Structure formats: structure tokens, C-alpha cells
Amino acid sequence: LFRSTAMVWDVVGPVCESGDWLGRERALAVRPGDLLAVLSAGAYCMSMASNYNTRGRAAEVLVDGAQATVIRQRESAADQMRLETLLP
């Protein structure tokens, strides 16, 4: 479904916390599959990241003009489990 006009959305984060708001009542002309850039991401940036609720840490992308470069890969479930030790 393509929307040529903006609709009002609440933009929330991926964890089950009542304070996980990234934007309230934002007018956005978006459609399924679109990506949103969240600037000044606070706790979503690597220096403040955690694995709360077993969420993998996000990739980081450096944007310079029209060029975007992934500078840190997204953390996978295997990355998280690598440091775990299973008891016999």
C-alpha cells in the first residue's frame, strides 16, 4: 500500500517497555518495507547498548553525503551465545 500523503504514527522501539518511544505523533509518508533513520538514538547507539530482553545490538551505519557504509555489523544470536557456558 503506497501512501503519497503523510499519516500520523507513534514510533516505538523493539522492547516491551512503556518508555521505549522514539517519536510520538509523527507525520510520516511511509509504506511497508520502508526504513526509518533514527538520529541521536541515545540508548540505541553502541556506547549505551545492552542485550536487554536478548535483543541483539544494532548495526551502525556511517553516512557521508550520499555514501552509506556499515561500520559495525548487527549482533547475531550466535554472537550473544558465544560467551555462554552450558553446564553439564
Spans of model-derived segments:
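Charged (often Lys/Glu-rich) extended helix/loop segments that serve as interaction or gating elements
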Residues: 2-88
